[in-house]
Amino acid sequence: MMNDSFGARLRRERERRHITLAQIADTTKIKASLFQGLERDDVSRWPGGIFRRSFVRAYAQAIGLDPEQTCREFVER
């Protein structure tokens, strides 16, 4: 079993659904570069606090994952 990072799992799920980062950015009105960072497990350029959780929820919803579960996994990583 692969021991993927949180970001790598999100990217795999997004690609499996044939959704581009540009599509997510268009849907969420959040820059694609921020989601690229999420998929690389690098959120250093993100605003802090509640915004991070909001971005993760928006990404999850845009690719069809459970937003609350995904957010919990993000916080616990």
Annotated model-derived regions:
Residues 1-77:
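Cytosolic/nucleoplasmic/matrix-facing N-terminal domains/tails
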